[in-house]
Amino acid sequence: MLMSTRKKIWFWCLGVLLVSAVSIFFMFSRISRQRQYFLAVIPHFMIDPVKVQDFYSFLKGRFFPSHEMPDQIVLLSPNHFFLKQKRVEGLCTSGRIRFKDQTIVATPFVDDRIACNGGVFYEKGGQIYTKDHGLGEHFRWINQFFPTVKTVYLLALPTHHMEHASWLAENIQKLPWKTLVIASVDFSHYLSEVIAEQHDQVSFSVLQQSGAFDQLRGLDVDCPACLGVVYRLASKEKIRVHQRWRDSSSTIVGKDLMDQNTSRQFLWRE
């Protein structure tokens, strides 16, 4: 009788341990799959595409080591060609989007505040196109470094309409699992290298500060609103900004191009 009671106690203890182990396993599984977002600012000015490629490689290794991939990518660009558009513009339907000789499969980012018929994307002969280089110049790098990502959102923002940053950041924050957010942004335009470098130092300094959202609109960049989305996301998690490189068309060719100069910063947050 005593042995039978001991066996019952032993089996009960074993059952408790097994249940606890399973609970702990699922708890850690949920933790490892909780919502995460990874933030980067990458130029679309391709005077030196090798450096852009190197930065994508750097981000892949830093954010997604081994064979990991993000579950989705959100690519934010200034709306270069439809400057009167006050709404964020995205896709109407899923499909393969073409820019020059590059294509990418993309998905609509569903929100009533997003327009999809403003001209950033257009259909011709059954093919959806974009001519906006802020989006299209990144297609080849996304395909190269994140080839198995099935969900890519393409959004063109009215450059200085900062009111979109908060709600976009909130929506992105709700996306499941791992999200890579790329703000496609070029920095100083049409200035001598000395002035451009000064402006870029100011921009980086502002991005480093907390509570500086209202200052973003005045920065010498082509999409303050894109930076605003990343800034809002970073502020929620207190994620710091880091600079990988800063260059310009002047530093690349080795002479001051003056009013033909465009500068770039390669930034990430963690």
Model-derived features: where do they sit?
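Divalent metal-coordination and catalytic microenvironments
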Residues: L76, I142, D186
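Short, Lys/Arg-rich N-terminal segment immediately upstream of the first membrane anchor
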Residues: M1-K8
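Conserved beta-strand elements of the Class I
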Residues: D71-V74, L180-I182
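Flexible, D/E/H-enriched segments
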Residues: W10-D71, H80-W177, L191-E270
